[in-house]
Amino acid sequence: MKKHIYALWAFFILFSQSIAASVEVRSTHMTTGDGVANNSIRYIYQDSKGFIWMGTLNGLSRYDGNSFVTYRPEGGNKISLIDHRIRDLEEDKNGFLWIATSAELFSCYDLKKDCFVDFTGCGEYEQLYSYKMTDREGNVWLWQDGNGCRKVTYMNGEFTSVVFKKENNNLPSNNITYISEDEQGRIWIGSHDGIAQVVGNKAVLVEENHDAFKMMSFGKDVFFLSGTGTISLKREGEDSRIVTRLGEGSKVYSTMRLQNDWIVFTEDGSYVFNLRTHQVSRDTELNIARGQVQIDNRGNFWIYNHTGKVWYVNAKTRFVKSFQLIPADKVNYIDEERYHIVHDSRDIVWISTYGNGLFAYDLATDELQHFESNINGFSHITSNFLQYIMEDRAGGIWVSSEYTGISRLSVLNEGAERVFPEDETLSDRSNTVRMINRMPDDKIWLGTRRGGLYIYDPHLKTIESSRYFDSNIYAVEEGADGSI
């Protein structure tokens, strides 16, 4: 009985619909015809209740697994979605969904009461802000280069906010480039004109004439990096001081931290600044000019620089692997590289590209698979110009595209491998398995529809011998004397 079950399972593995060597999926597609607000979906998010939210170019859609609800700006005095062009979504710890739009305006949606709310507490929710940061206490900081910033607090069921602006005499400059929190919980505001530390409801200038690019916290020390590679150090009770300059005023593109090393990517390559010793060296393995850094959902780094090549860096082990995801002849036609990366619950890394489809990298097998849209037949993605990717809590992979809707991929063959005795490109059912049997020596004998008899090692990895017969083999048995 066990042998028959084994044979049926092998037959299922071999003849399920395949899209790649080791990842087999089923896909469903949704467009405006199914209720999505717009076919160009720029962001996907699953909230704490399980709803899937889709930010599109013409409204916000909420999907419950069966139907859609669409939100768009409304007239009148009722608070509604502030703009129809959505670019980012995130839920905070109080159950509010923060919605960033292309108009540099934010909306805030109460997921418990199903309504939009005034997050400022004073009717100023139409102020321009481009970026958002949430501190460890749950306060939301909004800012824009030119309009200062706002600290939003939700407490006892009410929103209150504090505006930091030069005109209010509580901010040295309105031209904010970042707001960051250090390991001690202190808030730092970087601008094109210097660095300020938030003390109460006022930002106090700690360094002038510093075109702020990034802050890095190391214990009680705080380092500030300028847009031209100057690194300053601020210690408790001491004035800020310059500790080094990277190159000759090279333009900084991005940074990442690996243990005690702060890696800075500039126009002439990368530099390594050791946060403990303050020593600077050149990075030989990651000497990537104009490198841009993305961090995936596991905290690992992905670097790209408009060459179509992407470098993966494991944040804990520092392991580096590169992938050529977009050919050189294609990347020149793409003005802005757009990659989104999700490391899923199966240890498969999914990478969406803008212009060359979808990739899946299996960490266990070190195999990279490529999924493309095919206008001449069925495809699991509907465009090669992808805009976002997300894994839901059931393990489904959501892939959105530009102008062609969204796909949900379900992985079918978790823990299974496909075995092709014959050439896997054959379409004449030559790989139909007629017989499979484990012999007393643990070797596996397998017969195919073409009369082929294959002898595999005990793990079905290696063919040790093969021969063909004039008819199909349906059974095999070894006698007491060892004869077959």
Put a short name on every predicted segment:
Residues 1-484:
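Carboxylate-rich, polar loop motifs that coordinate divalent cations or form catalytic acidic clusters
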